[in-house]
Every structure is written in structure tokens, then in C-alpha cells.
Amino acid sequence: MAGEGDPEDAAHNMGNHLPLLPAEEEEEDEIEMEVEDQDNKEPKKPNIINFDTSLPTSHTYLGSDMEEFHGRTLHDDDSCPVIPVLPQVVMTLIPGQTLPLQLFSPQEVSMVRNLIQKDRTFAVLAYSNVQEREAQFGTTAEIYAYREEQDFGIEVVKVKAIGRQRFKVLEIRTQSDGIQQAKVQILPECVLPSTMSAVQLESLNKCRIFPSKPVSWEDQCSYKWWQKYQKRKFHCANLTSWPRWLYSLYDAETLMDRIKKQLREWDENLKEDSLPSNPIDFSYRVAACLPIDDVLRIQLLKIGSAIQRLRCELDIMNKCTSLCCKQCQETEITTKNEIFSLSLCGPMAAYVNPHGYVHETLTVYKASNLNLIGRPSTDHSWFPGYAWTIAQCRICASHIGWKFTATKKDMSPQKFWGLTRSALLPTIPDTEDDISPDKVILCL
């Protein structure tokens, strides 16, 4: 077991430390480092989930007495503001995604205090090369909850922020106090017209009906009427040389429905009213919960159209069905079929441990090729009521995530896995058509 002062151990632990074992229990600890293959004997998914899915999104481990702010700060499209950069944040933030932080350095604490007095906005850079700190794109983040406290005489700032707008990096300068200032260009969202707008007479627009999708299908009349509307939606395609299915490939409503079918496989109790109805917000919501690496995520962040972003996300969800260890690249950890949602924001969200490391954690029912390190601990658990145990790759021993086990017998699920996105590599399984996964091109 790594020492408490080991920075690598600090990144993987959720609590301040793992319980130290007496000398006579060292053999027992060795027994706990077993491959978790016994999960295959259990059913894939429990029938009932009685865990309060609002708890992970509230980030109660940061404290319940945080000062909350209201209002939003939005910059004009194509404007070029200068925004301070938080150097500790190393993740590709998606607009609408929540970012929890714990900051300890005096430089960062002072910076956040100044932000609170101004517009509460800072820049999160999407590093294409983390080692060389290279970034061409990023996202603005706005602080909406804030708390200061002292831990053993050290000032600590706890923050909850949310991603707002995409930007392109124009220039980065470092001030005399060490704070980086980024001059950025706010990227606009390109809103495309309806696929049928080119062949429809504008003079008849006042006669057309633009209905909203029924929330419930219990009413048979609403269901039948909606089916008729869907059939007639692309009726004008008969006036063109292209079939109607081609137009549906670029229709926002159709793309959103196809993605929702995929999301229901992750969450059988998914309520459509909990998802954004706007295609732009919906596309960002999906991007934030996709277990993809930074390369693919930056590609999604660069896309300026919700239609194109939705098409790419649907392509990724259909093709990248296997998740492997990023270090080994061939050791399969889990598959898309094992993903499920234990949070209101979806199957994946960002969490921060007491040492300030941010982990985007994906919840899955089953995982393979993993060893457990240490014993379960409830310290600083991101899922209240569950104890966590560090999980490493069986082949290369790199950190993959944690196994969560319920502390009470009446909780469901009794156990699940939380896998950190940075340790996963989405892959395309081999097909019978002898097409190499390397040759399969995603819709990017």
C-alpha cells in the first residue's frame, strides 16, 4: 500500500487515508487483492434501485453550508475576453457540466476570492498535451457555490462551478504572481434550419403545427397523433430527388430520439422531462456522460453545430462498445451494456477527492480484470451509504477506479464500480467483416 504522502496514492484515494493494517493482518490484505471475476455469477442489473440519485449531484461531501450565487455570466459570441486560468484543473469541461473543486494553494485561494468579487468566471483549458500544457480550446466555468474553511491552519476553498461557453485560445500570459491569463475567443453555436425548410413554402408556415412531444404515452390518442406527425414530417421529401430517410439523418428531433433509446439502456427509469429539450443543451448533456478519452472529447468540443455533435455522439455510442485500460490498451475492463445511471446527471459525473484531484467517474454494474487494494472505507464517499475500495488493472497495476459496496443490506444495488474516465480507452470490438478497429472512421 502506498504511503499517505505518495502523490499518486493521494490522487486515487477518496478519503484522507486508507486504514492502516496491523502487521498480523498483512496476509489478509494480500487475500483481498483478487481478480473480481465472481461478479459474472450475479444478474446484470437489479430490478430496483432505491439509492437517492440526487445525492451525488449535490456533492454533499464538500459540506452543506456553501454560499450559493444566482445569475449567469455569458460573453457575446466571437468576443475576446481575458479570463484567468485555474492551473490545477486538468480536464475537458463540457458546457453544462458540474465541476467540484478543493483548492489549497494560497495562489489559487486568492484567485478564487477575487473571482467571487467579480464575475465568478474562470477558464478551463482542454489540454491536447497535458505534459507540455498545450491547449487550443476550452470552456468557461462559472462558480455557483463557494465555501472557505481552515484545515490544520491551512486555508481551503471548496467550489462548485458549471461549464458555460466554449472558446478558442488566442494567447496565454503569466502574471508576476504566477496566475495565468488567457485571451480567448468565445465560439458561437451554429443553429441550422430544418432539413425541410428548403422545399417548404414560407407562406404556409402560419398553417403548420409545431407540436411538442407528449410527456406520457398513456393517452392512446396522443400516441397515434404523434406517429402521424412523424410520418408526415418529411412528406415534402417526395418533392425532391432524395429519400426522406436521408433528411432524417440531419433532423435534430430524430437524432435526439435515437440517442434517448441508448440512454434508456443505461437508465430504465429515465424521465424525458429530466433531459434538456433544446438540441444544443441536450448534445452537451450527452457529451458530458460519454466515457470517451480526451482526444474524442476535444473533437466534440470543437464542433459548433448541435446537429453534427449529435450525429457524432450517436456514432460513438453505436461503435465504441468496449472500454479497455488506457495503459494496456487491450485489457477489457467493461462494456457499454454494463453502464447504468446512479445520478440525476447521468452515468458519469465529475467528483473531487480531499487532495483536490478531480475524477470523472463512470458507474457500471460489472467490471473485469481488476484487483482490489486495501479494505473498504466510507471516508469522503461520493455515493453516501457506500464504501469504496481502490481498483487497479490486473495486468499493468494502473489505477482504474473503485469498487463501491453498500453499508446496509437493504440498499440496492449492493455493489457497483466507479471507473475514472482518464483511465479508460473506448475501443471498437473486432467484427466478422475483418475490418480493423483502427480503420473504422467515426463521424467526426
UniProtKB/Swiss-Prot annotation:
Among PROSITE patterns, the record links this protein to: CULT, LON_N
Q: Which UniProt keywords are present, listed alphabetically?
A: Cytoplasm, Membrane, Metal-binding, Nucleus, Ubl conjugation, Ubl conjugation pathway, Zinc
Q: Where is this region: Disordered?
A: 1-52
Where does the CULT domain lie? Answer: 320-428
One of this protein's GO BP terms? Answer: locomotory exploration behavior
Q: Where does (S)-thalidomide bind?
A: 380, 382, 388
Any one of the GO CC terms: cytoplasm
Record SMART domains: LON
Q: Which Pfam families match?
A: LON_substr_bdg (PF02190), Yippee-Mis18 (PF03226)
Q: Which SUPFAM superfamilies has this protein been placed in?
A: PUA domain-like
Q: Where is the composition biased (Acidic residues)?
A: 23-37
Compartment(s) of residence:
Cytoplasm; Nucleus; Membrane
Q: Which InterPro entries match?
A: CULT, Lon_prtase_N, Lon_prtase_N_sf, PUA-like_sf, Yippee/Mis18/Cereblon
On assembly, the entry states: Component of a DCX (DDB1-CUL4-X-box) protein ligase complex, at least composed of CRBN, CUL4A, DDB1 and RBX1. Interacts directly with DDB1. Interacts with KCNT1. Interacts with ILF2. Interacts with TRAF6 and ECSIT.
Regarding protein family, the annotation reads:
Belongs to the CRBN family.
The name of this protein is Protein cereblon
